[in-house]
Every structure is written in structure tokens, then in C-alpha cells.
Amino acid sequence: GYQFDKGYISPYFVTNPETMEAVLEDAFILIVEKKVSNVRELLPILEQVAQTGKPLLIIAEDVEGEALATLVVNKLRGTLSVAAVKAPGFGDRRKEMLKDIAAVTGGTVISEELGFKLENATLSMLGRAERVRITKDETTIVGGK
């Protein structure tokens, strides 16, 4: 699998309280190059993923404010199985690592530099993985598609 040293942004994303891990099976992976705080940008893709019934991993520079609150509420209500982690690395190295994750999972990096806006993201831009395991310190992506 592909592993990096960033864990879940919020412990509310944990799926197994005993091991304090978040495990997502047959997941979509949204890879975003920027900070996500505006929930309006995130809602269109959340709704598309929710309709598939599959879980979603969000990898972004950060997820904060109302966007994070919305993810937590959806997770707690059972509307959407979701977890968010910060992107690994910094600066140009982060860009390379996000490209690597996109390559491993068959996804696209949502980057405004490249002309992709988060609010226009579609399911076809998302990566896929058989299994994602997240602890407070690290994320492992297994069986990228």
C-alpha cells in the first residue's frame, strides 16, 4: 500500500473506537491541493459520493471551519462514511506526493493551478482504493484502482 505520515484531522472520523482507527472499505479518494473551509465548494462532490453509498477519504492541505463541521455531522448521522487527512509534505514536495497518490489511486489532483475547481469535481476525478486505514499519525491506502 501507499503510506504517509498524516493522520485524521478529527477523532470524530474514527470507525473503530478500540483501535482508534478509521477504516474505509472500497473508498473514493478526493485529492485537493488547497485548504477546504467553505462547505459550498465541497457539497457538490459530497452529494455525488453519498449517492453511491461508498465511503470517502479527503486529502487536502487542511479541512477546517464549516467544511470540517459538515463532514463530522454527516459521519455522525451516518449520511456519509467520510474521513479527512492533511496532505503530506510541504510546497513542491507536497504537490509531488499528491500526484503520487493520484497515480496510485487513479484519481486527479483538484488544483486551481491546473484549472480544476473543487465545486466542479466529479466522481471520475476521484481516486479509488480497496481499503484505507487511518490512525492519528498515519494513513495507508491499499489496493489503489
Curated annotation (Swiss-Prot):
Subcellular location: Cytoplasm
Keyword Cell inner membrane: no
GO MF terms, alphabetically ordered: ATP binding; ATP-dependent protein folding chaperone; isomerase activity
Keywords: ATP-binding, Chaperone, Cytoplasm, Isomerase, Nucleotide-binding
EC number: 5.6.1.7
One GO-annotated biological process of the protein: protein refolding
InterPro entries: Cpn60/GroEL (IPR001844), Cpn60/GroEL/TCP-1 (IPR002423), GroEL-like_apical_dom_sf (IPR027409)
GO cellular component assignments: cytoplasm
Pfam name, any one: Cpn60_TCP1
Catalytic activity: ATP + H2O + a folded polypeptide = ADP + phosphate + an unfolded polypeptide
Family, as annotated: Belongs to the chaperonin (HSP60) family.
Record function comment: Together with its co-chaperonin GroES, plays an essential role in assisting protein folding. The GroEL-GroES system forms a nano-cage that allows encapsulation of the non-native substrate proteins and provides a physical environment optimized to promote and accelerate protein folding.
Quaternary structure, from the entry: Forms a cylinder of 14 subunits composed of two heptameric rings stacked back-to-back. Interacts with the co-chaperonin GroES.
Protein name per UniProt: Chaperonin GroEL
Annotated source species: Thermus thermophilus
